[in-house]
């Protein structure tokens, strides 16, 4: 399976388009993805990579906002920082009912150290060396976030930072790669479980791209 198929598989699995979750086998899933991708234009495929920040949308605005126009054209794959079941349902309805292919949106948020229940920052959690507790904190965050319509978190952060002046050092697990790797594994398991079959699990997105934590003089 190529990367395009894999990306779309994740999208469809998490969103439940046309009851994909009920597919019986990987072969069925591959066929479903092949058929859908053959229907997509290049613009629609690129649109699946678009993740606008739209936290300002309120209930009732989705139909008239600029983002609604883009959703109808298939130019949006997900929304970032949109919170609230009513608002998410309002926007999702636009995608499913008014876009050409009816592909539902992903809804992502920086669920870094809890969602409604706040836990210590990742740097603080790392000091415990308690992988069971760390995994449980991510599990609780996933349950709460998924109940609010969120299905994608940009966590854990695995940047190794050895300069405390860097403003994002609190989001990571410190300067030890071994500890950071253990914590990342625990958090991913807490967020999405073993196979993401439950509706109270969310996708984890390990970040950031290579060497982002190797800042100079603490500058981001």
Language-model regions: role of each:
Residues 21-220:
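Glycoside hydrolase catalytic-domain context in secreted enzymes
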Residues 1-25:
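Bacterial Sec-dependent N-terminal signal peptides
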């Amino acid at each position: 399976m190529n990367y395009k198929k894999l990306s779309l598989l994740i999208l469809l699995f998490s969103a439940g388009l046309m009851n994909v979750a009920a597919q019986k086998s990987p072969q069925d899933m591959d066929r479903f993805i092949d058929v859908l991708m053959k229907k997509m234009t290049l613009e629609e495929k690129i649109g699946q990579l678009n993740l606008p920040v739209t936290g300002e949308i309120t209930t009732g605005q989705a139909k008239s906002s600029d983002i609604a126009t883009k959703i109808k054209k298939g130019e949006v794959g997900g929304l970032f920082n949109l919170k609230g079941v009513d608002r998410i349902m309002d926007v999702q309805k636009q995608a499913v009912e008014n876009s050409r292919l009816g592909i539902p949106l992903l809804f992502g948020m920086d669920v870094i150290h809890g969602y409604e229940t706040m836990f210590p920052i990742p740097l603080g959690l790392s000091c415990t060396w308690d992988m069971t507790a760390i995994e449980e904190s991510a599990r609780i965050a996933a349950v709460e976030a998924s109940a609010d319509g969120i299905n994608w978190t940009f966590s854990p952060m695995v940047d190794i930072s050895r300069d405390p002046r860097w403003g994002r050092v609190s989001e990571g697990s410190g300067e030890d790669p071994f500890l950071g790797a253990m914590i990342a594994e625990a958090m991913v398991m807490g967020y999405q479980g073993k196979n993401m079959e439950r509706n109270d699990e969310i996708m984890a997105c390990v970040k950031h791209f290579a060497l982002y934590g190797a800042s100079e003089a603490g500058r981001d």
